[in-house]
Amino acid sequence: MRIVIKNGIVIDGFGGEEKADILINYGIIKGIDKNIDVSDAIVIDAEGKYVLPGFVDMHTHLRQPGFEEKETIRTGTESAAAGGFTTVACMPNTNPPIDSEVVVEYVKAVAQREGVVKVLPIGAMTKGMKGEEITEMAKLKKAGVVALSDDGFPIMSAGIMKRVMTYGKMYDLLMITHCEDKTLSGEGVMNSGIIATMLGLKGIPREAEEVMLARNIILAKATGAKLHIAHVSTKGSVELIRRAKEEGVSITAEVTPHHLTRTDEAVYNYDTNTKVFPPLRTREDVEALIEGLKDGTIDAIATDHAPHTKDDKKVPYDMAPFGISGLETAFSVINTFLIQTGIITMKALVNYMSMNPARILGISNGIRVGATADIVIVNPHEEYTVDKEKFKSKGKNTPYHGMKLKGVVEYTIVEGQIRYQKNKKFEKVEI
């Protein structure tokens, strides 16, 4: 399949930004120039639109195997394509967890057969994600995991976590940590503060995140492991990460679109779609997260896409599961609240959502001749109203339902194949 993308504003991920055409032939970018004309090619007119390296999500929950009522690899990757993501890294909190090479191979096989975008498995740090016995990391790496994490089941034992990092360093595996001291978070369901008190809901204090983050930084410094901090949510965490980077610790961090744009005030109406972990914090925290993103303390924007069924969320707030379905609104949310307001540029977004996540995960990305054609075309000016019922994901749990957002994904191209086109039903063609 040959594709020519014409007249778009190309941000290549390497510092370049220009109006140009792109020629794609059999999955590879063959030309970037003015006025490319070839016969027998699909022509995409990108006039007035941005042509960007495909987004890479470091933190996606695809739920398969074990929780297919919430999401499958098929529906999750369809959702990813609709959001402009060409690659997603899937968390190991499945049933069974991704803690053995057998489960890794299963995920890869299903992704190859049914996936719409590229899927990178993340392996568990401990068997069953129980925080007791470390997994066989050499076998997991050989099977194809790109990182290790126990996701929402943080390892409470510092001794075991140090062993995990020591072996992770040995096998050159990225350590992705969900920083939570469960003795501090307890049964909390939202940010600890005046709003939680007013609503009669149990709070989760900042210290629950910051204490565990501080411990993990100390262990990473001691072992030399590559540490990545998932879904940073507090001002104190930003300060800890900034200091760690200044001290030379091998540390990177991510923040979600919802933590960058929403506060605990969103919980006022007890909408369970605002229940997420870590919880939505205060305006002061949001401002610190944005500043951390801008100054390089935080490296990436990741969705923490956590789909749930409608019945899961149709319960009292304190009984509902944590999680937001975030793949399909990520670009629009960042574009609306950060780009259109002048806080960051589209070129910066490419770093946060395309290039830095790829670099951290150890994969290639970017638009240049000879590169794999993983590309997203976006219209930053088109406004739409979020309708959760139109999501490709099984998870309709979004706090943005009914909200007007600016910025839509027009096309998602994965290895030279059109995997998503706005307003067109998708039919998978083998890559």
Swiss-Prot record:
Positions annotated to bind Zn(2+) 1: H59, H61, D151, D304
UniProt key word ATP-binding: no
Pfam family, one: Amidohydro_1
Domain of life: Bacteria
Residues annotated as catalytic: D304
SUPFAM superfamilies: Composite domain of metallo-dependent hydrolases, Metallo-dependent hydrolases
CDD domains with a match to the protein in the record: DHOase_IIa
Cofactor: Zn(2+)
Gene3D superfamilies per UniProt: Metal-dependent hydrolases, Urease, subunit C, domain 1
Residues that bind Zn(2+) 2: D151, H178, H231
EC number: 3.5.2.3
UniProt GO MF annotations: allantoinase activity; dihydroorotase activity; zinc ion binding
Reaction equation(s) it catalyzes: (S)-dihydroorotate + H2O = N-carbamoyl-L-aspartate + H(+)
Entry keyword set: Hydrolase, Metal-binding, Pyrimidine biosynthesis, Zinc
Gene Ontology CC entries for this record: cytoplasm
HAMAP family: PyrC_classI_B (MF_00220_B)
Biological role: Catalyzes the reversible cyclization of carbamoyl aspartate to dihydroorotate.
Name of this protein: Dihydroorotase
Organism lineage string: Bacteria, Bacillati, Bacillota, Clostridia, Thermoanaerobacterales
